[in-house]
Amino acid sequence: MATIIAKIESKINEYLKARNKEDWKEKTFTQAEKFSGIPRERIVSMAFLMLSIYVLLGNFLPLFSHIICIFWPVKESFMILRQQKNPSDNILLYWILYAMVSLFDYSALPGVPFYYFAKTGLFLSITTNGFDKLKEWSEPALKFTETWVLVTPPPPGEEEN
């Protein structure tokens, strides 16, 4: 099996080598490599894998997406409850984001072929190192939202505009 995969990978690598810099395929792959920082061989392999999973799972893709997205926070939440610790910010932020994204599960977005792949990829990236990036983005948004949603006095030392 490994030899078959190696042969397929070598054929893909040979096909994807830079040939003509003016070709539209070459420009597309170059842009994708620059944008993602991932080699074109890996991009094509991931796209092929996603397409294969989509074809094989079909109607069960939403179920697998929900199972994958819920596994980590449920496990972490149960560990926190058993140890009777205060919940971490990451767990709370994850559940908030999951609730917001789940609102779109019953809209027109699931009709988009790769919606569940994007959703699963988002949540898998958040469980690894995405929380730092998410916190950088969410702090200004939370401060802005608090100014018009919550009617609370500003913290001491800050003046209202």
UniProtKB/Swiss-Prot annotation:
| Source domain of life | Eukaryota
Q: Which InterPro entries match?
A: TB2_DP1_HVA22
Protein name per its UniProtKB record: Uncharacterized protein C06E1.1
Species annotation: Caenorhabditis elegans
Top-down, what is the taxonomic lineage of the species of origin?
A: Eukaryota, Metazoa, Ecdysozoa, Nematoda, Chromadorea
